[in-house]
Every structure is written in structure tokens, then in C-alpha cells.
């Protein structure tokens, strides 16, 4: 399907707007994946707050110019599916990692987070980032454990003091 100039400009404008507000981006090759499976992936992406789009590589290079995702330019070769995480930096990486596990033809090429390229072999770094709620829960449990430990040490010191006296 040939796109005229106005269509191309509209695509670049739409995806650029999403890229400006995105926390991370993941690039994948979806050759050989059935339409049904891709529909499932897109549905899961919408539920996870991930914007997915297949865009021509030349247009994607224009989209990422001047953004933290400019480092991904070299990965725009062949069929490219790009996903932008809008709510949580690891959402798209987690989604693609799980999908690639079930679909051998789906290949994650690379990801970008804060201007740094993350190779496909290291995608776990991004996928295992805790969500905001998980991070708060971990912090609260660490603070709770620290105060409980401090109480135990104080009681032990008091006990030792009384035994020594």
C-alpha cells in the first residue's frame, strides 16, 4: 500500500507524540507470527499501557530523531514492530519477553531506556524492573524490617546490660 506525503506526515506526527511521552521502547521482528497471535499481543499491550505500531523504517528514523530513543536507529532493519511503554518502563519488555517465549518466530531486537540501548540478550534487565507499586512495597518492607531489627538489637542490648549489672 503506497502512502502519500500527508499520510506519512500523519504517521510520523502520531508516533512522535507517543515517543515524546514514553518511558522506554522495545523493537522486535514479528515475521512469521500469525495474525491471531499478533492480535492477542496488541490486546495485551493495550491493557498494559503499551503503544505498538508497525512503521516503515525510514519513518521510524524520523520519529526517533531528537528523542532518547535515537540510539535505536541501527535496529530499524527489516520488518519492525516498535512498542513504547507509557506507564511503566519495563511493561513493553515484559510483554515482548513473555510473547517471545511462546512464539519462536517473534524476535526481540533491542530496547532503549533513558537513552541507552539494551541488547536483546540483556532485555531481562528492563523486563524485571519493579512497577511503582512493587518498588514502594519493597521500600516499606525494608523500612519495616529495619525498625524491627533495631528494636531487637535495642532489647538485646538492654538484656545484656541488666545481666552485666
From Swiss-Prot:
GO molecular function: large ribosomal subunit rRNA binding; structural constituent of ribosome
Coiled coil regions in record: none
One GO CC term on file: large ribosomal subunit
SUPFAM superfamilies: Ribosomal protein L10-like
Ranges annotated as spanning the membrane: none
Family classification: Belongs to the universal ribosomal protein uL10 family.
Protein name: Large ribosomal subunit protein uL10
Organism whose genome encodes this protein: Sodalis glossinidius (strain morsitans)
Amino acid at each position: 500500500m503506497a502512502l502519500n506525503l500527508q499520510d506519512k506526515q500523519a504517521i510520523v506526527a502520531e508516533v512522535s507524540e507517543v515517543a515524546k511521552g514514553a518511558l522506554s521502547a522495545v523493537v522486535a521482528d514479528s515475521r512469521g507470527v500469525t495474525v491471531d497471535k499478533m492480535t492477542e499481543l496488541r490486546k495485551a499491550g493495550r491493557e498494559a499501557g503499551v503503544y505498538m505500531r508497525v512503521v516503515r523504517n525510514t519513518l521510524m528514523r524520523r520519529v526517533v530523531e531528537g528523542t532518547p530513543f535515537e540510539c535505536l536507529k541501527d535496529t530499524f532493519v527489516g520488518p519492525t514492530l516498535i512498542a513504547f511503554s507509557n506507564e511503566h518502563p519495563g511493561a513493553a519488555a515484559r510483554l515482548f519477553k513473555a510473547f517471545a517465549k511462546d512464539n519462536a518466530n517473534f524476535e526481540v531486537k533491542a530496547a532503549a531506556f533513558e537513552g541507552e540501548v539494551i541488547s536483546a540478550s540483556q532485555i531481562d534487565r528492563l523486563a524485571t524492573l519493579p512497577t511503582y507499586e512493587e518498588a514502594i512495597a519493597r521500600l516499606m518492607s525494608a523500612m519495616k524490617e529495619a525498625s524491627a531489627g533495631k528494636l531487637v538489637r535495642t532489647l538485646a542490648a538492654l538484656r545484656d546490660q541488666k545481666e552485666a549489672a
